Each structure stands twice: as structure tokens, then as C-alpha cells.
Design a protein with these regions (language model features):
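A short acidic, Gly/Pro-enriched loop at the edge of an enzyme's catalytic core
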Residues: 100-110
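Short alpha-helix
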Residues: 188-205, 211
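A short SAM/SAH-binding and catalytic strip from SAM-dependent methyltransferases
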Residues: 108-123
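A short glycine-rich, Lys/Arg-flanked "PGG" loop and its adjoining helix->strand segment in the class I
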Residues: 126-138
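Conserved class I S-adenosyl-L-methionine
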Residues: 1-39, 52, 56, 141-173
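Class I SAM-dependent methyltransferase SAM/SAH-binding core
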Residues: 52-98
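C-terminal lobe and adjacent flexible extensions of AdoMet/dcAdoMet transferase-like proteins
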Residues: 204-264
Length: 264
């Protein structure tokens, strides 16, 4: 299934997903808050779904424009922003590979927290990154999320381990190419090998500031951690943010977040 119809039917679950996966959200937000210029600068959340990050950043005082391929995601984002009593500058229905309606050098920060999951070809991924770079101001910060090559294998090991022998050809395809194009409950996707990320982003003109595994050491077994509150929860966020920066653990996370600066 293509990304647009998938998310049109999945918007409430996508909003809830980051409640079930609190570590991913908390670690990603930690990196965003560390490297994004202070509010009230301007931010484009391109492919931001129902607005989890956009609404949180708006709450912090950023001027946030949310763009997404799914109209249902945008509708839910407007609803959630109203409930949170925050304002988004705009909500735009568009594809992250073509931001022709947005002016160049317009934003202090750009988030690509989903589009690169669903662009199967290298050329499309480069196009999305270059479009994000175009609308980013000089020395602006780009935050790009990826799903790792090994995430679907962890998922199947927990839920349906027989999948590996029932679909050996497809499993080999995932390992070798990272391309998910089969009719399953998830949209078509590209699962990146961790070694690809920095070369890809730097080839587009970015200076690397940080690469972090968003789940640290708790990918697919974070239920008990997610129940924590207060100091115990913050201690695990601190630990996972620290360990997520260890290159030997990049593949242990389901998601990677790249942080780069536009040079030149």
C-alpha cells in the first residue's frame, strides 16, 4: 500500500503510536531540543503525520508549519492542536519530495520524521533531502528519521517468528535491499542500513552533528520502561539518549535520527 492511503486510514493509531513508544519520542525530542535554534524560530515539519512533534514544538514557542501527504493526518493534527490550545502557522497537504509551494531559505529547522521511511528509491530520498535543504536557511538544522534494516526482523520475532521460514525470499530481499513492497499491514517502506545514513546526508551538503538510535537499548522491549514516571523515566531517557549515540548500537534501534547543519 502507498503511504497516502495507508496514513489516511491510520491517523489515530499513528498519533497513539508515540504514546506506546515513548522512548522513541523522548529521545528524538531530546535531540531536536538540543540542536534546534531557540524559539520563536520557524520550523517546517515535513511529513509530520498527525503532528506529535509539530504540536510539542508549537507548545514550546516555535512557529511551526506542518506538511503531510495525508489529509486525514492533517485533520487530526488541527484537532489535536486545538485541544492542546496551540497554534500551527499552517497545515499543508503536499509530498515531501516536492515543496514547490514553499520559498527557499525560509526555515530555521526542518523535520523529516517520516518521509524517508516510504521513499523506496535512492533518487526519491535524495530529492526529499534536497527539497528540505532548499527551504532551510543557511546554517539551519535538518532532522531526518529512518527505520533501520533490522527493525522488521525484531517485530516479526516478537509477533510471528514463523514468518522467517514462511517467507524466506522476502526476508532475504529485506536483508539485501531494505525494500518492503509486499501487501502487509504497513505501507511500502525502505529500511536503511545504519552505514548508509551519514554518507547519504553528507552527499546532499549537510554537516553531520549527531546520529542517534532513538530506542537506545529498549527497542521492542520497552513496555516496563514506558510505565515509569518522574526521575526513573528521565533516567532511562538519559541513558537511551547516551547509548543511542554509540555506533555499535545503531542497528539495535528501530529508528535512527540524523541531525545535520546546512553549510554554504
Amino acid at each position: 500500500m502507498d503511504a497516502e492511503p495507508f496514513y489516511d486510514g491510520y491517523a489515530p493509531k499513528e498519533w497513539e503510536r508515540l504514546e506506546r513508544h515513548r522512548t522513541e519520542f523522548a529521545v528524538s525530542l531530546r535531540a531536536i531540543n538540543e540542536f534546534l535554534p531557540r524559539p520563536p524560530c520557524s520550523v517546517l515539519d515535513a511529513g509530520g503525520g498527525p503532528g506529535r512533534y509539530a504540536i510539542e514544538l508549537a507548545r514550546q514557542g516555535y512557529r511551526v508549519t506542518l506538511l503531510d501527504i495525508s489529509r486525514e493526518n492533517l485533520r487530526l493534527a488541527r484537532q489535536k492542536a486545538s485541544e492542546a490550545q496551540v497554534s500551527l502557522v499552517d497545515t499543508i497537504h503536499a509530498n515531501a519530495v516536492d515543496l514547490h509551494g514553499l520559498g527557499s531559505a525560509r526555515y530555521d529547522g526542518v523535520l523529516l520524521m517520516g518521509p524517508l521511511y516510504h521513499l523506496l528509491s535512492y533518487e526519491e530520498r535524495v530529492q526529499a533531502i534536497r527539497e528540505a535543504m532548499r527551504v532551510l536557511k543557511r546554517s539551519g538544522r535538518l532532522f531526518a528519521a529512518f527505520i533501520t534494516r533490522f527493525a522488521p526482523f525484531r517485530y516479526e520475532a516478537i509477533g510471528e517468528p514463523g514468518w522467517l521460514v514462511e517467507h524466506p525470499v522476502y526476508a532475504q530481499q529485506l536483508l539485501e535491499t531494505g525494500i518492503h513492497d509486499q501487501p502487509t499491514e504497513f505501507a511500502k517502506a525502505y529500511y536503511v542500513h545504519p552505514s548508509e545514513v551519514v554518507p547519504l546526508m553528507e552527499s546532499c551538503g549537510l554537516r553531520t552533528l549527531r546520529l542517534v538510535g532513538c530506542e537506545g537499548v529498549v527497542a521492542e522491549h520497552q513496555e516496563k520502561v514506558n510505565e515509569l514516571t518522574g526521575a526513573a523515566w528521565e533516567a532511562w531517557v538519559d541513558l537511551n539518549y547516551k547509548l543511542g549515540q554509540d555506533p555499535t548500537l545503531y542497528g539495535a534501534s528501530d529508528h535512527l535520527l540524523y541531525v545535520g547543519e546546512k553549510s554554504g
